[in-house]
Amino acid sequence: MKIIVKPFHEITTQELYNILQLRSEVFVVEQECIYQDIDGKDQKAIHIFFTENKKTIAYSRIFNEGEYFENPSIGRVVVAKSERGKELGKKVMIEGAKYIKENFTNKNIEISAQKYLKEFYTDLGYEFTGSEYLEDGIPHIRMIKDQSI
């Protein structure tokens, strides 16, 4: 497995195609959520993706503070259905947190988590803040991780 970390302008056309294909497979088709995944924010993001045999198997995108939330954030966390159960979601989140800690001044991470994944994120050190809300028809919660130490 290869771990790739790139800003948008360094992503190849094939890498972008594979990333968007994975996001669409999971967020639009599997979760039956019709929404505009290509939201105009990818250009500002740092993209972390895991590949195997030229296929993207896990992905997330990172934003610096003020680009998405008040704090740096990790979003669009996704793992290919065929690769689940291998802790790739955890690994891609850890890579994102590491990138933020090493490259951004503000070390805290703010995420908009699908509610059913609250325990997954809690196990990674995120704390629930605020109230539940709907995002694209799916219940979400705001969570923050303090990495300032």
Task: Please report, for each region that a protein language model flagged, where it lies by residue.
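Conserved GNAT acetyl-CoA-binding A-motif
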Residues: M93, I100-A113
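Conserved acetyl-CoA-binding loop-helix of GNAT-fold acetyltransferases
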Residues: V79, G85-K98
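Short amphipathic alpha-helix that is part of the acyltransferase structural core
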Residues: M1-H47, E52-K55
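Conserved catalytic-core motifs of GNAT/GCN5-like acyltransferases
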Residues: E110-S112, T122, E127-R142
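A short beta-turn/loop motif at secondary-structure boundaries
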Residues: I38-Q43, G66, L134-D136
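Conserved beta-strand in the GNAT
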Residues: F49, K55-E65, N71-S73, V78
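A conserved beta-turn-beta hairpin within the catalytic core of GNAT-like acetyltransferases
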Residues: E65-I74, R84, N103-K107, G137-P139
